[in-house]
Amino acid sequence: MALMQDFKKFAMRGNVIDLAVGVIIGAAFGKIVDSLVNDLIMPLVARIVGKLDFSNLFIQLADAPAGVPQTLADLKKAGVPVFAYGNFITVAVNFLILAFIVFLMVRAITRVIDTNPPPADTPENTLLLRDIRDSLKSKNQ
């Protein structure tokens, strides 16, 4: 029974719950970024480049057996070595967009939550004491 109580204490700590919420929101955010990339950005890139699906971009490194279609999936299935760089391009674009969006979010949050409060106004009595001090210094010199 003590094991269950210890687990309950562990699971209900603020850090664990915050982490769980972060993972869930992160997974959902990843889907949003995937949609942003695949549905909005990649079609614009395709309009410029002329190709929408980068996952099938590859360089064939050896001759294929006779009768094998020249597609990435078929060449891999036939055991032909290929340099498949297209999927990497797509994943790299996803990462860069995700990193940029996270940067913008963190930047916005840090601006909203200003950790340095503005300096307090100097009290009137302190200003008066400074004037007296400065006056005494000037008389002594």
Curated annotation (Swiss-Prot):
Domain of life of the native organism: Bacteria
Transmembrane segments: 16-36, 86-106
InterPro entries: Mechanosensitive_channel_CS, MS_channel, MSC/AndL, MscL_channel
A single MF term (Gene Ontology): mechanosensitive monoatomic ion channel activity
UniProt-listed Pfam families: MscL (PF01741)
Record note on quaternary structure: Homopentamer.
Protein name, as recorded: Large-conductance mechanosensitive channel
Organism the protein comes from: Ralstonia nicotianae (strain ATCC BAA-1114 / GMI1000)
